[in-house]
Amino acid sequence: ASDVYKRQLTYDKFACNQYLKGFGVRIAESLLLRGGQSVTDEDVMEKIGLPCFIKPSLGGSSFGVTKVTAKEQIQPAITKAFAEAQEVLVEAFMDGTEITCGCYKTKDKSVVFPITEVVSHNEYFDYEAKYNGASDEITPARISDDLTRRVQTLTSAIYDILGAYGIIRVDYIITEGEKINLLEVNTTPGMTATSFIPQQVRAAGMEMKDVMTDIIENKFRD
C-alpha cells in the first residue's frame, strides 16, 4: 500500500482495523454503515450480537459512542453516532482488560513504551472517563511479562505495517487466554500532562521534551 493510502487509513477506524486484520491482527466483529445507511435490529443481533458498541468510524474522543445492551437501544444509538460522523461502526463487545501502548521510531532506534492499563469507573472508556478523570490508569499494566512483550512486539509491527511517523498509540483489549485484540490505532495521541503517552514516557524514565526533540531531529536527518 502507498504511504498516502496508509496515512488515510489511520483516520478511518474500520478501514484501518480491516487492513491490519489481513496481517493476522485480531479485531472485533463489526459492521460499517455509510451516509445514513440503515440496518435492522435483527441484522445487528445476528451478525454482531449484544452487548455491542455503536460509534462514529472517524475521529476520536469517544463522542457519539453508545454501549448497546438491549434491542430497543440500537436505532437511537445509530442516530446518535450519525450526528457525529458520516460513517458508523457497529462493533461486538469484548470482555477483558483494556490496555494501551505507545511507540515511536527514528532512523536509528525503535522505542516502545511501558503499557498502560485502563480501568474505567464508567461502563466503558467514554468521553467522561477519557477527559474528566473517571478512570484509573495504571502504568505499567498489571499483566504478565510474556504478555507485555507480545503487546510491545505487536505495537512495533503495527507501526511498521502502517508506515507510521512520530508517536502512535495502539489500544487493545486482552480477553480470556491472554488473547490480544486490537481496538484502534491513534496516530495523533493526546499529549497533555494526564494523557497516556506522557505517563508512559515518565514510566520509561524518559522526558517528554527529549522524545519530541528526538522525533523532530530525526525528521531533518538525511
Language model region names:
Residues 1-5:
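Short, small-residue-biased leader/transition segments that mark boundaries at the very start
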Residues 8-96:
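Active-site nucleotide/adenylate-binding loops and adjacent lid/helix of ATP-dependent enzymes
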Residues 62, 118-121, 186-200:
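Glycine-rich phosphate/pyrophosphate-binding beta-alpha loops
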Residues 69-153, 174, 179-181:
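Phosphate-binding site of ATP-dependent enzymes
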Residues 92, 102-103, 159-191, 201:
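Conserved metal-phosphate-binding beta-hairpin within the catalytic cores
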Residues 117-168, 199-222:
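Active-site "cap" helix and flanking loop/linker of ATP-utilizing ligase/carboxylase catalytic domains
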